[in-house]
């Protein structure tokens, strides 16, 4: 069941400029990020053993104390997502060369040890709220591509049993950037040329078949992410505008209100890949000159930024090593 939008915004109008908005990052001193107890993991293109490749880097919220978690010269690790308990990271790895190249889903401990393959020829993984389940999308084709929407079917992987189960809605396809709600009942994602949609942000049930197009609420663009309590979402409104809104998933259908931009950059740069901090007070994102924002796409000069919800944003990396896809790492849950 697909519930289509009937009152979409005309031509996806560009968001209004923020009052007094700054189109470039503020000075680093504008936000006190050193006091934040959470860290950030992201993909970065840098040299390992004399060879440039994609690695996963972990930093403090202010960009300090960088650690290369992967250090694999012959494997490209990308698209990291930290588990809600702060102990693990799921990601994709591009392995092989030429026609044998393939994108696979893995997870590992936060320190880079204990790597486990989840699925071959799969992509776009994210965690369930129990930190024991990973959702991922099967690749649409066997031949390697970085095209973000080249996906079909959503799967669940149980870390304890190793079992894979399909989502009940077998019609899910051409999705990307799936995000699982904190209560475990919903996903939000982008669809491109699939399921009766051209390009839209969707909400759909984790254990049902209903799919809802959020376009009618003014939620247009791509790559949505839930806030930590499931009552806010953030996403990219355009290449230059990042949005945030309130979302209510407790009724018969999703409702989105208070849609607003919070960061805007100049047209020579782009902003992508928003992610809420575990306390809901900050949003991390990627920023840099016009480039390929897709997972594994080349983006020279891109850095990781952090903003508060009022739109004060700063760069936390400055090396421009194609730093993208930031994901906040919660403080690890202590064992009882």
Walk through the language-model features, giving the residues of each:
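Bacterial N-terminal signal peptides
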Residues: 1-4
């Amino acid at each position: 069941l697909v519930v289509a939008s009937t009152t979409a915004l005309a031509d996806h109008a560009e968001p209004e400029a923020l009052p007094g908005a700054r189109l470039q990052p503020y000075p680093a001193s504008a936000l006190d990020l050193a006091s934040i107890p959470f860290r950030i993991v992201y993909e970065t293109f840098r040299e390992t053993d004399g060879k440039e490749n994609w690695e996963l880097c972990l930093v403090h919220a202010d960009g300090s104390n960088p650690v290369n978690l992967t250090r694999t010269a012959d494997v490209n690790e990308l698209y990291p997502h930290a588990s809600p308990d702060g102990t693990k990271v799921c990601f994709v790895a591009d392995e092989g060369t030429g026609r044998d190249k393939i994108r696979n889903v893995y997870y590992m401990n936060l320190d880079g040890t204990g790597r486990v393959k989840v699925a071959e020829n799969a992509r776009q993984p994210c965690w369930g709220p129990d930190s024991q389940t990973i959702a991922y999308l099967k690749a649409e084709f066997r031949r390697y591509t970085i095209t973000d929407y080249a996906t079909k079917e959503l799967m669940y992987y149980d870390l304890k049993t190793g079992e894979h189960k399909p989502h009940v809605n077998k019609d899910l396809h051409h999705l990307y950037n799936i995000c699982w709600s904190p209560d475990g009942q919903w996903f939000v994602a982008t669809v491109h040329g699939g399921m009766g949609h051209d390009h839209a942000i969707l909400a759909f049930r984790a254990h049902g078949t209903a799919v809802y197009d959020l376009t009618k609420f003014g939620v247009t663009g791509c790559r949505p992410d839930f806030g930590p309590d499931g009552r806010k979402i953030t996403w990219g409104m355009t290449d230059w505008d990042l949005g945030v809104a309130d979302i209510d998933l407790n009724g018969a259908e999703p409702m989105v209100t208070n849609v607003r931009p919070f960061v805007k950059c100049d047209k020579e740069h782009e902003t992508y890949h928003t992610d809420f901090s575990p306390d809901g007070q900050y949003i991390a994102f990627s920023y840099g000159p016009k480039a390929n924002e897709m997972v594994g796409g080349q983006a020279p000069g891109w850095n990781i930024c952090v903003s508060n919800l009022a739109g004060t944003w700063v760069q936390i990396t400055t090396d421009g090593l194609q730093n993208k896809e930031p994901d906040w790492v919660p403080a690890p849950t202590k064992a009882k």
